[in-house]
Curated annotation (Swiss-Prot):
Keyword Coiled coil among record annotations: no
Disulfide bonds: 47-119
GO aspect biological process, one term: positive regulation of calcium-mediated signaling
UniProt protein name: T-cell surface glycoprotein CD8 alpha chain
TM segment ranges: 190-210
Alphabetical list of SMART domains matching this protein: IG
Native source organism of the sequence: Rattus norvegicus
Record Gene3D superfamilies: Immunoglobulins (2.60.40.10)
GO molecular function: identical protein binding; MHC class I protein complex binding; protein kinase binding
Compartment list: Cell membrane
Keyword tags: Adaptive immunity, Cell membrane, Disulfide bond, Glycoprotein, Immunity, Immunoglobulin domain, Lipoprotein, Membrane, Palmitate, Signal, Transmembrane, Transmembrane helix
GO cellular component, one term: cell surface
Amino acid sequence: MASRVICFLSLNLLLLDVITRLQVSGQLQLSPKKVDAEIGQEVKLTCEVLRDTSQGCSWLFRNSSSELLQPTFIIYVSSSRSKLNDILDPNLFSARKENNKYILTLSKFSTKNQGYYFCSITSNSVMYFSPLVPVFQKVNSIITKPVTRAPTPVPPPTGTPRPLRPEACRPGASGSVEGMGLGFACDIYIWAPLAGICAVLLLSLVITLICCHRNRRRVCKCPRPLVKPRPSEKFV
């Protein structure tokens, strides 16, 4: 009997898209409308029959990765019995009836169970189908925050003159001047002019000493001749 039901459903559900558009009405209500499941999570779907005139409910599944329109029969459940598809694991799928609600339980969700689930009932020789419920793996989206660049600090204006090489003679923002000296890069701009001035002064002093020494050698140190007085000058 169960195999006949499976064959009957398989033949009638080849035109699933057309049938669902024609027969989906207020007879069936499926909840939740969408499921984002994690791997290993238990998933429960509830098919509520608003007019309980059916003898049972069938759960079906359409794989999202399959190109075939034919869905896969999962389980048939009624108030007295339930029949699972022979190719499915009984530890994975189970179903039960509570009043006018038919509950399908997927014990451990995996990627191969992703797809669209729906239920079907037969009432007065008419098949009714519920809307498709997408059941897919939950995607954890990672939101990256934009990186904002810190504004470049502007140094305050100062009244002191800028050095010739500020990058060499001025310490950095995080650096510190170590030791007593300013460093060779800065000392050369201070001592070079001083050394030049000292050299000019020394050269001037040497030239002055040489000139003075030559002038002293030109002075005649010979004794002066004695001038004898004339006779006319003696008896005046």
